[in-house]
Swiss-Prot record:
Gene encoding the protein: aguA
InterPro entries per record: Agmatine_deiminase, Peptidyl-Arg-deiminase_porph
The name this protein goes by in its record: Putative agmatine deiminase
MF GO annotations: agmatine deiminase activity; protein-arginine deiminase activity
Origin species: Streptococcus pneumoniae (strain Taiwan19F-14)
UniProt entry tagged with the keyword Hydrolase: yes
Amino acid sequence: MMDSPKKLGYHMPAEYEPHHGTLMIWPTRPGSWPFQGKAAKRAFTQIIETIAEGERVYLLVEQAYLYEAQSYLGDKVVYLDIPTNDAWARDTGPTILVNDKGKKLAVDWAFNAWGGTYDGLYQDYEEDDQVASRFAEVLEKPVYDAKPFVLEGGAIHSDGQGTILVTESCLLSPGRNPNLTKEEIENTLLESLGAEKVIWLPYGIYQDETNEHVDNVAAFVGSAELVLAWTDDENDPQYAMSKADLELLEQETDAKGCHFTIHKLPIPAVRQVVTEEDLPGYIYEEGEEERYAGERLAASYVNFYIANKAVLVPQFEDVNDQVAIDILSKCFPDRKVVGIPARDILLGGGNIHCITQQIPE
């Protein structure tokens, strides 16, 4: 049994620290990406090209789709033939830690498609559960096996200075680690991520089918500095959820004892929903969660990704698109803040942050 990453001197850097690269997966699952994923593939391509300006992009694509991916991307990425069940690299990829000698360690969590038999979104996730270890093997990095502890990368944020941010709604959900107490879960996070403190937000984004991942509702943008998804509409269920998160954050400090500067990032003014036109595009397998017309999607500008040279921000053809870009431009003066049309990723059930996973330098 390997010592915990914390005992070995490893920690999880912040996303805004320098990257060696980014892991992504080509979107091909018919139950996630409607109409052969054509629109999703265009969106993924724009994201990959933007990230690739400042770092290496590793793209997992199975042999059957390699020619297709190459027709979009040419030689902009490193193609790896690692099998997957879907394209959520944030949740299936490894969490890569560093130590002060610059050595890296990949943490491999158990993955059960956001809830297993209790409320998972698909039932065959065998390949997804192997992505982290297989990718770490390609990178030739040692692996810390955190299994059977169930966790997705989208469920944690790190400030790189000892503070981990999570939501209670996700980490305490019955489909993850029902046999563990909150205290045991917190201790596992601290030991596995080399951290000093876990901050538990009560909620994420309304109707988020990941049981409200933190990466859709709040994110570190600097030392003791956060953005939080927000609405002023008291009739929106999101209002009470964001308000509870804000009240907690205003009382909290980071691992070093500093109070947070909190920037409110509005959610889109117009609700993003599944339409009748979207529905014929999906092809589901047995036991897979199905979409319905009028279903509210968990749209949030907080699901941005911080690459070496750019911050990639979801856009929804909404009045708040530019507001989000302006706020994030102030948070990241040294990076290009790029809006990416993101409805076609949202239709798959996540957004830009959910399909990317940073590999620290």
